[in-house]
Amino acid sequence: MRKTKIICTIGPASAGEEILTKMCQSGMNVVRLNFSHGTHEEHLEKIKMIKKVREKLGYPLPIMLDTKGPEYRIRGFKNRKETLQDGQTFTFTTRDVSGDATIVSVNYAALVSELKVGDRILVNNGLLIFEVRELTETDIVCDVIAGGEISDHKSMNFPGHVFKGDFLSEADKSDLLFGIENDIDFVAASFVSNKENVSELRNFLDENGGEDIDIIAKIENRSGVDNIDEICEIADGVMVARGDLGVEIPFIEVPAIQKYLIKKCRLLGKRVITATEMLESMIHNPRPTRAEISDVANAVYDGSSAIMLSGESAAGKYPVEAVRNMAEIAEYTEKNIDYVKRFYRTDYVIKNNLDALSHATCAMAIDTKAKGIVISSISGMTVRMVSRFRCPVDIVGMTTSQKAWRKLNLSWGVTPVMSDEFDSVDVMFYHASRHAMDILELKSGDNIILTGGQASKQSGSTNTIRLETIR
């Protein structure tokens, strides 16, 4: 049973019912909708299709809304694109102009006040580099350090800068309200820099009926890396968004930062996603490169909760094959990891009773050579806490909540199961063992670990571990 989960971005190549069904059957666990592209009407059609497929399959397929975030972009050119030469002068302006080879408008009115002479501006994911030479009230006059083709609406990055102002734009707020209305499960928040960004998002969701939506903080700049501990105090998970991260900081640092963030999240009990360009060549080719296979495998070795497909599944020629290849790479890699040794040598942070109980659950499962861990949890919190320890024993997460059932499909090593409410712990554990027998294909003599609470209708009541032997 594969433990590392797979997130797939849905786009023109994968929005149909047949393709979505095949992607689920090939290993997709979570769908991602990128709100940097498309209208609400287009996203609504995708959401309807996703819900239709998951109902047809009886599969807990959660929906992740990825926000635009504080995006900075150039506006348009007369001829849609221009070619800039190294060493020439080029101006970014807050005025409304029609762009040419010397000037282009930007979408952020306060940009001039945020920069200083000597700062660098990167355009189109760092392919073009500019250095600020002069600032006026409306213009940023630059020297072109690395030229090339520049075209309409390309992204801008400002390494080392965290701009002032509200984290959530009006466009983001509109998208979030749309997501709440359509029962999305996760929000992937772009360009999170600090705790305050996550707090602003959490408050907005809570005030508008999105209390049960989990926040995944996308780490895409130096501030996000530096502030990871405080970000994890509020965020429910982290995405290592290597695309913009490799533009905002020197790209040679990205592998080390990836490992650092994954380890940090595992120790703190947060879900962590490795994303961007994992099987990039499969946008055009039916098989991944050897380097891409190694990249996916290393993300699994590092302990990622999930790995993600972007353009490969949204706009590529081979979305189903990309999912299947990623699943096969992950499953084979997991077979070559000694999770028992890793469990005992890792110095986990144990902050409370639930942490201690979850750690003990894993230790008991390993020591008794159990074939499975079955956890009954209203909110899914206990299941996620057991998952954080990366126990080699398969985990079945039982819940009475549809939302928790779906969200558990992002947790490492967990098979989510919908269950009824039970009046006693004995009845709950009886049904838990029945579920385990079906899902884990247990036989007489197999041990399983059962974890739950005496008051099954009350979230946060987990206080019991039981060892059962199948008769």
Indicate where each model-derived feature is located.
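Non-catalytic helical/linker scaffolds that mediate oligomerization, partner binding
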Residues: 1-471
